[in-house]
Amino acid sequence: MKSLRSSFMLFLGLSLSLLFTFAALATRNPIQPSAAAPKYHTHFVYYDVQKMTTTTLFTIEGEWHAPNWTPDGRYIVSDQGDDLYRIPVSGADKGKPEKINVSQKMAATNDHALSWDGKQIAITSLAAPNRTPTGLHNVILIMNMDGSAAHEVHLGWLHGWSPNDKYLVYAQDQEGNFDIYRVDSDGSGELRMTTGKGRDDGPEFSADGKWVYFCSDRSGKFDGWRMPADGAGPGDKLVEKVTSGGDTQDWFPHISPDGKWLYTISYPMDHPDHSYIGDGMKIKMLRLQNGVGAKGAKLTTVRTFFGGQGSGNTGGWSPDSKKFAWTEYETIPEKLN
C-alpha cells in the first residue's frame, strides 16, 4: 500500500512539473492566431503602345486587381481584399497604396471604374445582403474619389461609365440570362441592352459615346462585340462582331480613349469560365478601323502571364491612350516553420 501511495505521489509530481513547464512555455511564447499570409505578389504591368514594350510599374504584396488609371495620369485605383486604394505611379510614394476610406460599408470587388471627369468612382460591392434572388448581393455604389458620399445606385456587375458620365453600363443575370444593361447614374431608367442567348459581359462605352463594347459567347466562344449606345435592338440585330478566331476565350474588350486600339484579357480555350486563375493568360491587342478590326486584322498576343479575371476586367488605359495596365501574380512560396 505504501509502495502504491509512493508511486502515485511520484506520478502526481511529474504531472504537475510538466503542467508548470507547459504553462511557462505558453506564457513566454503565447500561441497567436495565424494571420493568413498573402498568397501572391502582384506585379502592376503596363504595355507601351508606341514602343511595343512591357514594363513592370511596381510590385505589391497581396492579390490586387483591375488597375484603373486616373484621368490626370497620376494614380492607379485598384482593389485588394474588401477595400479600394489609389496608388501613385511616380515620385517618392510610387507604388505605396493609399486606402480610400469609403463612407459606407463595402466589400469591394474588381468591378470598378472611374468617371470620365475623374470626380467619382463606381464599384460593385458585395456588402448588401438580401438584395438579389441569387444571393450574390452585388450592388453598385457611387462615391467621390476620396470615398465620401458613397451611396447605392443599382444592382449589377459594373463595368463602365458613358463619356458624359450620365450612364453606367453593367452585366447582370436578371431574367435567367446574363445580359448587358444601362442605367442612369442616379439609378433610374434601367435599359436592357441585349436579349440574345449566351453570356454577355464586360460592357464599356467608346470615347465618342456612340457604341458599347462587350464580350459574348453567343457565337460559340468568347469574342469582342459592340452595339449602339441605345441597345442591340429587337433580336439583337444591331450587334456587330469586333474580334474573332484565335485559340483563346477573349474577354473584356477595352477600347483606348482615342478609339484606335482594343485589348482583351484572354483565357486558355479550355477555361471559358472567367473565375480561372493560373498560367496561360494572355493580353491581346487589335488595331481598330472605324471601331472594328481592320480588314484581315487579328488579335495579337503581347503578353502571356499568370493571372486571372481580376488582372484587368475593367479598363486600364492611360488617359493619353499611350499605355494600358493590368496585374500579374507571382505565387509566394510557403514558409516552413
Regions found by a protein language model. Give the residues of each.
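Bacterial N-terminal signal peptides
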Residues: 11-21
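Blade/loop signatures of beta-propeller domains
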Residues: 30-52
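A flexible loop/linker signature enriched in serine peptidases of the S9 family
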Residues: 34-39, 60-64, 76-85, 102-109, ...
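Short loop/turn segments that connect beta-strands within beta-propeller blades
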Residues: 49-50, 89-93, 144-148, 184-188, ...
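A short beta-strand motif characteristic of beta-propeller blades
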Residues: 53-58, 97-102, 149-153, 189-194, ...
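Residue-level detector of Asp-centered blade-edge/turn motifs that repeat once per structural unit
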Residues: 71-72, 116-117, 163-164, 207-208, ...
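Hydrophobic beta-strand positions that form the internal "hydrophobic ladder"
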Residues: 76, 121, 165-168, 212, ...
